[in-house]
């Protein structure tokens, strides 16, 4: 995992996924 520019997009995607479905958010936390 590259933590440079992609980190910003990852956070944005995480927020969008969190809004759409909490289930996906749990998987996101595991990835982080």
UniProtKB/Swiss-Prot annotation:
Keyword Cell membrane in annotation: no
Pfam families: PqqA (PF08042)
GO biological process, one term: pyrroloquinoline quinone biosynthetic process
UniProt cross-link Pyrroloquinoline quinone (Glu-Tyr), position: 16-20
Assigned keywords, A-Z: PQQ biosynthesis
Pathway(s) where this gene product acts: Cofactor biosynthesis; pyrroloquinoline quinone biosynthesis
Transferase keyword on record: no
Entry function: Required for coenzyme pyrroloquinoline quinone (PQQ) biosynthesis. PQQ is probably formed by cross-linking a specific glutamate to a specific tyrosine residue and excising these residues from the peptide.
Protein family according to the UniProt entry: Belongs to the PqqA family.
Record's protein name: Coenzyme PQQ synthesis protein A
């Amino acid at each position: 995992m590259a933590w440079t520019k992609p980190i910003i997009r990852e956070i944005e995607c995480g927020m969008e996924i969190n809004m759409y479905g909490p289930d996906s958010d749990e998987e996101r936390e595991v990835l982080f």
